[in-house]
Amino acid sequence: MEELISNIDQQNLIFTDDEVDNYISLSKNNFDLGDEELLEIGFDVLNDYKERYKALLAHQSQHINKLSEIDLFSSERIHRNRKDQERFNALSMIKNYYESLAKSELISIMIKEEEFEKSVNKLKKRLNRRLKNLDQLTEDDLFSWIMNSKTSLYDPHSNYMSPRVTEDFEINMSLSLEGIGAMLTSDDGITKITKLIKGGPAIKSGLIKNNDQIVGVGTREESQIVDVRDWRVDEVVKLIRGPKG
């Protein structure tokens, strides 16, 4: 349980000290339970993580609405990296920290955007994107977190591969499927090409370049273009891939 919590809350920004102690005690007090029961406890922790993080993001969004430009000039210091810091003792302390984080992020955006309202809107979009990413977590994702936390206790070099990851691995090993020959990332809900792979279809076509955005994907099965805005990158990749040749 300690390994799982360390993996999902690496910066000590979601759970309080007492909450973590309770989770650990719960797992230790039920050491004689079967795998299914322990797995259920793990899922409960992950669902608590999702709900808490969503609530904190919503709190940040509400806090931003109350800020004025003059508020950004007050002097304040925060630890951006809290991995080695003690956990907060109360939820109110976590909320205060998230308010400071939102303020810091808004200042960083304003340095580039200059206009206060534009910066606020951009930050709100980022927070909405993070909320959507949370909503897009699947049971496979949660199960992978639990299993990888467990396997790392026995062998730090071993990892559990979810069905999605297994499929990717088999595709890469067999070379039976291919995509467009490009590395992708997500930027505010839009899948963007960050690098073209040498010898891949993208370079050969001459039609695709770095920083191109993918907002729709056409397939042989569907005559219409599928809108992939706000999709997970791995889902976009899955749709793009097709038989080699």
Q: What is the role of each PLM region?
A:
Residues M1-L4, I41-V45, Y49-R52, E115, ...:
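Stable alpha-helical elements in mature extracytoplasmic
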Residues E3-S6, L13-D32, L38-A58, Q62-S104, ...:
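PDZ/PDZ-like domain segments forming the peptide/carboxylate-binding groove
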Residues F88, S92-W145:
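Long, acidic serine/threonine- and proline-rich intrinsically disordered regions
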Residues L127-L175:
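Long, charge-dense accessory insertions within large macromolecular proteins
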Residues D140, P156, A202-K204, E222-I225:
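Short beta-strands and strand-coil junctions in structured, solvent-facing domains, enriched
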Residues W145-P156, N172, M183, L196-G199, ...:
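Generic, well-ordered alpha-helical scaffold segments in large soluble proteins
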Residues I146, A182, I193, D227-V236:
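Buried hydrophobic packing residues in well-ordered domains
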Residues Q213-G245:
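PDZ domains, with a preference for the canonical peptide-binding region formed by the helix
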